[in-house]
Amino acid sequence: MSTTTQSDAGISREIVVIGSGFAAQQLVKSLRKLDAEQPIRLITADSGDEYNKPDLSHVVSRGCAAAAMTRQSGSDFAEQQRIALLPHCPVLGIDPVRRLVLTEQGEFPYGQLVLATGASAVRPELPGSEHLVTLNSQQEYAAVEGAIQQARRILVLGAGLIGCELAMDMASDGREVTLLDLADSPLSALLPATLTQPLQQALRSQGVSLQFGTGLARIDGQPGDGWRVTLTDGRTSEQDLVIAAIGLRPNLALARGAGLAVERGILVGDRLQTSDPHIFALGDCVQWQGQLLPFLQPIVLGANALARTLLGTPTPLALPPMLVKVKTPRYPLQLAGRTQGEDLAWQCRWNSHGMVAEARDQAGELCGFVVGGDQMSAAFPLLRQLPR
């Protein structure tokens, strides 16, 4: 177990990481591969247990209990990686002048600090919003696991990537599921409506009721008695569970409190350095080159680059074209590159079980693509053709 180590100048050599999600743990692993002795401290408000977050979209079809999702306990992870772990230790603030992390268990000096504070599920502001359920962590799932098991009528608010996955999963054992979105089609931030038609058909064939072009206005009722939901178009229905899947909002409170530059996320440069030269950020909380990147591959690549930077070899983050996977088993999708824009010309090949759609710019160059259904094997050859 590591202990705080002081340099000759009296400044801690310890790399302190706040958070224990995928980004934090991936960074620890990357650091350890490069340096077996570097002192590392992980501070987290939860247990620090490792689990696979994408599994949260498939808990019904896989019969997955919350406790069974744990791959490795926080204490075992700390022992394996030879780090100091402070579980169940909320961080109260950061003092960047004295280079201290302030917690309920004391003050901890750092040589370099990494914020891996993640993002929280967005909750809409409407009457009864406290009755909404979110599934953005193992802890959130554990809190509502019983309610999910008992629910027969479920409304999923938000038809983005996670909402579509959840709706198909929740309907996999015959439940009455409604998928609701203000947009006119699912995955509206990712794809033109035409390319989502096969997915819509697959959702309907699973028994999902698609309600587009309308939103949620209010939720009324009492726990245990079901919920009466009212839509913005005035229609009402009775539901046992209402799940919010309308996106994530980076957790910025600690960064703001420390005076770091933030916009939608914590602003970082190419080396994932914040506006403070001794503080870095990684994962869902980060805004890099104007983008939020709440996907696993950018985190893995970011952790590898940041580990080298923290250990003395400044390494900019470079992201190649990356696949986004929509894990809807009845009609899976993979996409990459630029897939939205009125200037795109689409060339589509369809069959009864799948599609390949290529997006080309005004010069006729491939700039994005979508593959669906039984055409998954076309993804990697197209990915290699995208400009880097």
From Swiss-Prot:
- Which Gene Ontology MF annotations are present? oxidoreductase activity, acting on iron-sulfur proteins as donors, NAD or NADP as acceptor
Q: Which family does it belong to?
A: Belongs to the FAD-dependent oxidoreductase family.
Q: What keywords appear on the UniProt entry?
A: Cytoplasm, FAD, Flavoprotein, NAD, Oxidoreductase
Any one GO cellular component localisation term in the record: cytoplasm
Pfam families annotated for this entry? Pyr_redox_2 (PF07992), Rbx_binding (PF18113)
Which reaction equation describes what this protein catalyses? 2 reduced [nitric oxide reductase rubredoxin domain] + NAD(+) + H(+) = 2 oxidized [nitric oxide reductase rubredoxin domain] + NADH
Primary enzyme class: oxidoreductase
- Gene designation per UniProt: norW
List the protein's name: Nitric oxide reductase FlRd-NAD(+) reductase
Spell out the InterPro entries in the cross-references.
Answer: FAD-bd_OxRdtase, FAD/NAD-bd_sf, FAD/NAD-binding_dom, NO_rdtase_NorW, Rbx-bd
Name the EC number(s).
1.18.1.-
At the top level, the lineage of the source is: Bacteria
- Per the entry, which co-factors are needed? FAD
Question: Is this entry keyworded Cytoplasm?
Answer: yes
> From which source organism is this entry?
Aeromonas hydrophila subsp. hydrophila (strain ATCC 7966 / DSM 30187 / BCRC 13018 / CCUG 14551 / JCM 1027 / KCTC 2358 / NCIMB 9240 / NCTC 8049)
Q: What does the protein in this record do?
A: One of at least two accessory proteins for anaerobic nitric oxide (NO) reductase. Reduces the rubredoxin moiety of NO reductase.
Its main subcellular localisation, reduced to a broad class, is: cytoplasm
According to UniProt, this protein's pathway is: Nitrogen metabolism; nitric oxide reduction
Q: Where in the cell is it found?
A: Cytoplasm
